């Protein structure tokens, strides 16, 4: 197996894991994040973001496609308010 060499990148990405013992004392363990783990973490986060975006756009599409009574009421109120702001000048 090939070991990672100490480079400015690996030195700057060192992190500390603090674990509590049963007596309440803390021990510190130094370690470097594996580049594979970092990439895996990044891909997992981006996947969650994409899923959230898809969920939001799907809900929006459904609300426009099959409007509920509440969404119709909200839309009508917004139009009424904007109409009242313009006034009767037309």
From Swiss-Prot:
This is Protein PB1-F2. Is not encoded in all strains, and seems to be dispensable for replication. Residues 1-34 are annotated as: Disordered. Its main location: host cell. HAMAP family: INFV_PB1F2. It is found in: Host mitochondrion inner membrane; Host nucleus; Host cytoplasm, Host cytosol. The gene is PB1. One of its GO terms (cellular component) is host cell nucleus. It comes from the Viruses. Belongs to the influenza viruses PB1-F2 family. The keyword Membrane applies. Oligomer. Interacts with human SLC25A6/ANT3 and VDAC1. Interacts with host MAVS. The keyword Membrane applies. InterPro entries: Flu_proapoptotic_PB1-F2. Plays an important role in promoting lung pathology in both primary viral infection and secondary bacterial infection. Promotes alteration of mitochondrial morphology, dissipation of mitochondrial membrane potential, and cell death. Alternatively, inhibits the production of interferon in the infected cell at the level of host mitochondrial antiviral signaling MAVS. Its level of expression differs greatly depending on which cell type is infected, in a manner that is independent of the levels of expression of other viral proteins. Monocytic cells are more affected than epithelial cells. It holds the Pfam family PB1-F2. The record marks 66 as: Low pathogenicity. Keywords: Apoptosis, Host cytoplasm, Host membrane, Host mitochondrion, Host mitochondrion inner membrane, Host nucleus, Host-virus interaction, Inhibition of host innate immune response by virus, Inhibition of host MAVS by virus, Inhibition of host RLR pathway by virus, Membrane, Modulation of host cell apoptosis by virus, Viral immunoevasion. Residues 65-87 are annotated as: Mitochondrial targeting sequence. GO terms for biological process: symbiont-mediated perturbation of host apoptosis; symbiont-mediated suppression of host cytoplasmic pattern recognition receptor signaling pathway via inhibition of MAVS activity.
């Amino acid at each position: 197996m090939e070991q990672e060499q100490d480079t400015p990148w690996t030195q700057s990405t060192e992190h500390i894991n603090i674990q509590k013992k049963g007596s309440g004392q803390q021990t510190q363990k130094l370690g470097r994040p594996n580049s594979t783990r970092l990439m895996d973490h990044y891909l997992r986060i981006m996947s969650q973001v994409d899923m959230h975006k898809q969920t939001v756009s799907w809900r929006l599409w459904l609300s426009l496609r099959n409007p509920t009574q509440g969404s119709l009421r909200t839309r009508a109120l917004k139009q009424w308010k904007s109409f009242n702001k313009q006034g009767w000048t037309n």
